[in-house]
Amino acid sequence: MKNVDNYRRGYFMPPVKSLKWAEKEYITTPPTWCSVDLRDGNQALVVPMSLEEKLEYYHMLLKIGFKEIEVGFPAASETEYAFLRTLIEQNLIPEDVTIQVLTQSRDHIIEKTFKALVGVKKAVVHLYNSTSVAQREQVFKMSREEIVEIAVSGARLLKKYAAETEGNFQFEYSPESFTGTEMEFALEICNQVLDVFEPTPENKVIINLPATVSLSMPHVYASQIEYMSEHLKYRDNVILSLHPHNDRGTAVADAELGLLAGGQRIEGTLFGNGERTGNVDIVTLALNLFSHGVDPGLNFASMLEITAKYEALTRMKVHDRQPYGGKLVFAAFSGSHQDAITKGIKWREEHECHYWNVPYLLIDPQDIGREYEGDVIRINSQSGKGGIAYMLEQHYALDLPAKMREAFGYKVKNVSDNLHKELMPEEIKDIFFKEYVNIENPIKFLNFHFLNHDDFQTTVTLEFKGEIQELSGEGDGRLDAISNALQARLGLSYSNLIYKEHALELGSKSQAVSYVGVTGPDGVIHWGCGIHTDIFTSSVKALISAINTMIKDSAAV
């Protein structure tokens, strides 16, 4: 590409690296989760949420289980201020939930922030100022010392107004644009702020290290976090928080490695909504933990409901391939994938396996409110016999013989290919019935009669080419007798009769279904299916359907 020489790495490695985080295999305990949907997420919407919409979103966050929720920047707008006052005055903050508010390091802004907090029982007050080289040089045109003074003076003001306001206030500080800041300077400014706050075991301070713009690979961010974690003053009384953005598409990886490196808290949003490419997706982070057997402490058991409400309130779209939340994240169109999933699910049922280990499915879709039938097995021109048969069995209790599955699979794939679309279960059933079930052309079955139960001699009444005919025959069994009568009198030739039957339990419990395959002179197996309240009548209808299919297929050649 052109202009590649215009770019360089804009991050700063820590002066020392221990890389202890790299020795850890996985995250063993969940972080403290702080939703910033109502501030970081909301400000990034084309149409920000109204107060009523924010209230509905807030209640959804509570239902999911968030215990820390950033509710806004009350000094930034009247809507943000009014929303905070509504939560406080209507007593909408549960005892075990802490709200968080954002403020810049300016006296009148901090004063208005605490005015908005009057009456709250507890809250996190989040102070931030930009520290990166680019911000210092281009935006603020200030030295390091001047940037430190902004942070320190803001910290002093927080302490002052907190002392004058009733309530329990926890302080948070963010060196905004941390990833573009020299690590020694980021450490210096955080430690000077901590000296003002003087954290204690009873009143810990949150130091939040945002990847305001993601500038590096995740392992670099992890090394930066580890350096800060190992060198911050008052470390036992500091909660180290992470706030990754997704500019390089690595926010989840940044967060996960950052947690291994000493992070204890995550600020993020549902489905990664946020400025530019978004914040880290808490849904993905939480359910990644879940997939490793670690309880994330958040409840996404009703994922479809959460997704629908998110889309309605934010007017954003959850991508079909968005991890865990997208419509197609569990969908298998590929034949080999469908076959493996179907066999894996059946294996679990037969073995009563405790641990989830189904091929191609990271977690059990049912754990987040999804279904195997509609969400996992999907049918298009790439689908295989296993997935197609699975749909018929799950939706309509039709358990096709193995070889019939293959033949029917080709028919379904051809239809999907010609229509250029995915096929729904009802469409698949319609194809099956049209091709195989109770076929009456050119031979229409009318009746049969056996002389007695022990002697397999039969008379079959049918309509063939517009004429009513009675055919007689005998054989080793009742279906064999009817088959022999048909072959002898109608001049038909086939062999290797395949037969399977079972009760049709879904919909009509009194009905039975039979499947019959016959091998024609061309060596091809032709299939038919019969459905009737009498099990033997269903088998006769299946046989005649198979013969009709053979005649039709032969005529088409």
From Swiss-Prot:
Q: Where is this region: Regulatory domain?
A: 439-557
CDD domains associated with the record: DRE_TIM_LeuA (cd07942)
Kindly give the InterPro entries that the UniProt entry links to this protein: 2-isopropylmalate_synth_dimer, AIPM/Hcit_synth_CS, Aldolase_TIM, IPM_Synthase, LeuA-like_post-cat, LeuA_allosteric_dom_sf, LeuA_N_DRE-TIM, PYR_CT
Q: What is its EC number?
A: 2.3.3.13
Keyword annotations of the record: Amino-acid biosynthesis, Branched-chain amino acid biosynthesis, Cytoplasm, Leucine biosynthesis, Magnesium, Metal-binding, Transferase
Positions of the Pyruvate carboxyltransferase domain: 31-304
Return the broad EC class. transferase
Q: Which molecular-function annotations from GO does this UniProt entry contain?
A: 2-isopropylmalate synthase activity; acetyl-CoA C-acetyltransferase activity; magnesium ion binding
Give the protein's biological function. Answer: Catalyzes the condensation of the acetyl group of acetyl-CoA with 3-methyl-2-oxobutanoate (2-ketoisovalerate) to form 3-carboxy-3-hydroxy-4-methylpentanoate (2-isopropylmalate).
> What name appears for this protein in its UniProt entry?
2-isopropylmalate synthase
Question: Organism, per UniProt?
Answer: Desulfitobacterium hafniense (strain Y51)
Gene assigned in the entry: leuA
